[in-house]
């Protein structure tokens, strides 16, 4: 346990670092966005590149793969939509005045965040902006969306305010904001962090947002009332990435650890160590926690025991993103390569320290 393994396949077609990796809803394809200004589509069946998307005038910061289209955003201030069969650019969404950091496609809407201090909403089928969310005092980074159907139980006399759902944004100004998509108005400002908000995760049924910050904390918020519910304090460095799984929050940090917290109490129930640099990416899959780090390694931990099960070595620089499909781990790195790893045989039980039942859904 903990030993290194060789990659099943190394895909090195990009000529610059890979900034993001997105898995299609059916798990059959992967999309990578790169510093070389292109995005590439890959088959998960054989690891072959099946489409190249060219057109951005600067590096690709983020990407999202849907069933019928691929979406990319770039430092060239634009978002683009691509045909996954032909590689043709179907739409260019213009309006941001600086680097576009993130995109999120949901309910036939495209949301984007930018260094220009705004988030924007577009119809997926049109190139015209439908809403601008303005109010942050600095760069806007992470995005999350709560659809109207997720808010149904909370709707009351002001149903029209929530009719388009809620958008949650995090910013380097130290706040997160909750926006009414239908009107573009700020519904709540979530204040409490003393550093930039780098990541967020949304519990839509519970109307709760979890934010991670350079102030080394994770915070839980009621997105309807704006109330700060809990502060998770044990990290010793910036919180870089978050994932919410079965009412447990996993947080990856510059302190070289991942921590597992009970979402409803804020209790830290597990710390995953062994990283030699910051934890830059994480993904939970079938009882295993996969992590990517600035030390150029990916790791697999048993989530019940915290035991390190496997180390995946081969990348030359930081791993920026990871995905898992069936029995294969996909890692994308600033070294420009996408690597595929066999993860069969990881669920051998280690010494068990069960999480209290109240932390499970």
What label would you give each PLM region?
Residues 11-18, 54-60, 93-100, 134-140, ...:
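WD40/WD-repeat beta-propeller blade N-cap
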Residues 21, 60-63, 103, 140-143, ...:
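Hydrophobic core register within WD40 beta-propeller blades
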Residues 25-26, 65-67, 105-107, 147-152, ...:
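Residue-level detector of Asp-centered blade-edge/turn motifs that repeat once per structural unit
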Residues 304-361:
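Terminal intrinsically disordered, low-complexity extensions flanking WD-repeat/beta-propeller proteins
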């Amino acid at each position: 346990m903990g030993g290194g393994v060789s990659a099943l396949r190394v895909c090195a077609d990009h000529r610059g670092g890979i900034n993001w990796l997105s898995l299609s809803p059916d798990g059959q394809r992967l999309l990578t966005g790169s510093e070389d200004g292109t995005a590439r589509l890959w088959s998960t069946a054989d690891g072959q590149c099946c489409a190249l998307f060219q057109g951005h005038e600067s590096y690709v910061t983020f990407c999202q793969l849907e069933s019928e289209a691929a979406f990319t955003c770039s430092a060239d201030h634009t978002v683009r939509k691509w045909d996954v069969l032909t590689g043709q650019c179907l739409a260019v969404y213009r309006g941001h005045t600086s680097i576009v950091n993130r995109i999120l496609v949901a309910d036939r809407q495209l949301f984007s965040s930018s260094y220009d201090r705004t988030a924007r909403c577009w119809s997926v089928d049109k190139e015209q902006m439908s809403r601008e969310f303005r109010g942050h005092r600095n760069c806007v980074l992470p995005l999350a969306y709560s659809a109207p159907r997720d808010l149904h139980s909370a709707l009351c006399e002001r149903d029209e305010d929530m009719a388009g759902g809620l958008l949650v944004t995090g910013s380097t100004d130290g706040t997160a904001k909750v926006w009414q998509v239908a009107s573009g108005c700020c519904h709540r400002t979530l204040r409490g962090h003393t550093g930039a908000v780098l990541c967020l995760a949304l519990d839509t049924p519970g109307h709760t947002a979890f934010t991670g910050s350079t102030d080394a904390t994770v915070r839980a918020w009621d997105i309807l009332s704006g109330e700060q519910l809990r502060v998770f304090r044990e990290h010793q460095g910036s919180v870089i990435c978050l994932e919410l799984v079965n009412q447990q929050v996993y947080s990856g940090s510059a302190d070289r650890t991942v921590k597992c917290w009970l979402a409803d109490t804020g209790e830290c129930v597990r710390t995953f160590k062994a990283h030699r640099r910051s934890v830059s990416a994480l993904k939970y899959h079938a009882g295993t926690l996969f992590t990517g780090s600035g030390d150029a390694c990916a790791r697999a931990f048993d989530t019940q025991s915290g035991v390190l099960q496997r180390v995946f070595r081969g990348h030359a620089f930081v791993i920026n993103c990871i995905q898992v499909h069936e029995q294969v781990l996909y890692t994308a790195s600033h070294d420009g390569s996408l690597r595929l790893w066999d993860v069969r045989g990881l669920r051998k039980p280690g010494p068990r320290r069960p999480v209290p039942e109240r932390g499970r859904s």
